[in-house]
């Protein structure tokens, strides 16, 4: 009996070390950033069981077998659709400004579609204005409405939108709603999900959280897009979830959330529609590719129309494209660069690009919320401040609430607006969307919004920053070490 237990003990020990060795080899063989690999190895060797479970759950990008198969199956038809769309030459921009040219070429070559022109665009900064405009558009819809959000939180104006969407479905409008399972957990636990389905709306719970499948798919891979398409002609996107900020997370101690949304009319709705159709097919297996733009209603010839490129990310989409787009935009800056983000945990490459821009004479500003709803990200962000300040970057800490806007403005002409935070999760993991807009008029609108944020912010003083307590420096470095995993 003693021999039996001895053999079992040795087998357990051998299996334990083989498991550690196997995971270590897996980490080393995967092409990833060195800081990320080192952080994972440290966790695994300090807390082996916890580290192994964490790595198997969150260390690699697993979409899940069924969704991965759907993603592979959809691309031939999607690629053909994009190729056929090229015959509509009148919707594509033939040239761009000097500051936007490199970025638009990158996106065209990697996504297979050029930027589209002839769009009318409005930047909305007040949540009530967004909701009221959306309700009007829903009431006037004639054919179809598609929506996707990370968070839909019942209450306030969000309920008014839900009621108008149900009314549209009852009068025969084809309505589809996709919501992230984790972000919209309150919605799916409320009566609204059943009420919408009973009204005829197709409601899909995207990327369902299932602990039984934790090792088969990354549970922290989320559907983070915020998009609305109406009649293949009107589109919305931006940083705002379907929430009323007067009711949303009021116990978090960070104030009301501050967002922007872009409302668009024109062929950009078709470009966004194909992204939505890909998400829908990955989640449901149903193909809903949008029709080509209607030449009878698209304002193609309007000289005032904006040129816009959609940049999508997530499993199945061009890898690393949003990160490349941010790098390209940063290196394209010649006069000034303004970035707004709630969560700032940049890659080494992006941090280097931002610092280099400041060091070559570009006026670089970053606007962040002073109070953050994520303690981990808040502390990790602070670890980058010293290097940024030393390079000459101005850091503004917004004091008017939780600044949730995600925007970049380059030389007053190239604007990036969408759902992408400047952190690892948005850059490489989640389903995200960003609009690249080549237009001085829209750039002026975005600059006015950013100036308003700056007027409600406190400029970080480098001298005072360097005098902060030692315990804060230690906490910052601790969270910085784990920043590749955030």
Swiss-Prot record:
Keywords: Cell inner membrane, Cell membrane, Lipid biosynthesis, Lipid metabolism, Membrane, Phospholipid biosynthesis, Phospholipid metabolism, Repeat, Transferase, Transmembrane, Transmembrane helix. Residues 219-246, 399-426 form the PLD phosphodiesterase domain. GO terms for molecular function: cardiolipin synthase activity. The chain crosses the membrane at residues 3-23, 38-58. GO terms for biological process: cardiolipin biosynthetic process. The active site is at residues 224, 226, 231, 404, 406, 411. InterPro entries: Cardiolipin_synthase, CL_synthase_A, CLS_N, PLD-like_dom, PLipase_D/transphosphatidylase. Its EC number is 2.7.8.-. Its main location: membrane. Belongs to the phospholipase D family. Cardiolipin synthase subfamily. ClsA sub-subfamily. Catalyzes the reversible phosphatidyl group transfer from one phosphatidylglycerol molecule to another to form cardiolipin (CL) (diphosphatidylglycerol) and glycerol. NCBIfam families: bac_cardiolipin (TIGR04265). This is Cardiolipin synthase A. It comes from Escherichia fergusonii (strain ATCC 35469 / DSM 13698 / CCUG 18766 / IAM 14443 / JCM 21226 / LMG 7866 / NBRC 102419 / NCTC 12128 / CDC 0568-73).
């Amino acid at each position: 009996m003693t021999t039996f237990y001895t053999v079992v003990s040795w087998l357990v020990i051998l299996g334990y070390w083989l498991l550690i060795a196997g995971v270590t080899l897996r980490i080393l063989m995967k092409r990833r950033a060195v800081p990320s690999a080192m952080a994972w190895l440290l966790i695994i060797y300090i807390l082996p069981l916890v580290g192994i479970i964490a790595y198997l759950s969150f260390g690699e990008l697993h979409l899940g077998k069924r969704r991965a198969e759907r993603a592979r199956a959809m691309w031939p038809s999607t690629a053909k659709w994009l190729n056929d769309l090229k015959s509509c030459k009148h919707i594509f921009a033939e040239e761009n400004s000097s500051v936007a040219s490199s970025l638009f070429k990158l996106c065209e070559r990697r996504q297979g579609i050029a930027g589209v022109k002839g769009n009318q665009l409005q930047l909305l900064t007040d949540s009530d204005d967004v909701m009221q405009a959306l309700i009007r558009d829903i009431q006037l819809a004639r054919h179809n409405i598609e929506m996707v959000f990370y968070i839909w939180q019942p209450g306030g104006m969000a309920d008014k939108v839900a009621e108008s969407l149900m009314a549209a479905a009852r009068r025969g409008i084809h309505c589809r709603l996709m919501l992230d399972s984790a972000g919209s957990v309150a919605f799916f636990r409320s009566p609204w999900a059943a009420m919408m389905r009973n009204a005829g709306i197709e409601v899909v719970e995207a990327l369902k959280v299932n602990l039984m499948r934790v090792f088969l798919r990354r549970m922290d891979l989320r559907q983070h897009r915020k998009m609305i398409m109406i009649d293949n002609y009107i589109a919305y996107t931006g940083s705002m979830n379907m929430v009323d900020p007067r009711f949303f997370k009021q116990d978090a101690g960070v104030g009301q959330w501050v967002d922007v949304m872009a409302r668009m009319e024109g062929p950009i709705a078709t470009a966004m529609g194909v992204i939505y159709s890909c998400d829908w097919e990955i989640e449901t297996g149903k193909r809903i590719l949008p029709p080509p733009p209607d030449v009878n209603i698209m304002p193609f010839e309007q000289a005032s129309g904006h040129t816009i490129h959609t940049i999508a990310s997530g499993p199945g989409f061009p890898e690393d494209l949003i990160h490349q787009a941010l790098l390209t935009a940063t290196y394209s800056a010649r006069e000034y660069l303004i970035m707004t983000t709630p969560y700032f945990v940049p890659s080494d490459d992006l941090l280097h690009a931002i610092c280099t821009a400041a060091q070559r004479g570009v006026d670089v500003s970053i606007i962040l919320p002073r109070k953050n709803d994520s303690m981990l990200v808040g502390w990790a962000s602070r670890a980058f401040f010293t290097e940024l300040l030393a390079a000459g970057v101005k850091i503004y800490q917004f004091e008017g609430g939780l600044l949730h806007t995600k925007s970049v403005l380059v030389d007053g002409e190239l604007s990036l607006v969408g759902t992408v935070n400047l952190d690892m999760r948005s850059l490489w993991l989640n389903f995200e969307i960003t609009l690249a807009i080549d237009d001085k008029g829209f750039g002026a609108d975005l600059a006015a919004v950013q100036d308003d944020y700056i007027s409600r912010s406190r400029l970080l003083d480098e001298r005072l920053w360097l005098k902060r307590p030692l315990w804060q420096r230690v906490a910052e470095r601790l969270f910085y070490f784990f920043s590749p995993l955030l």
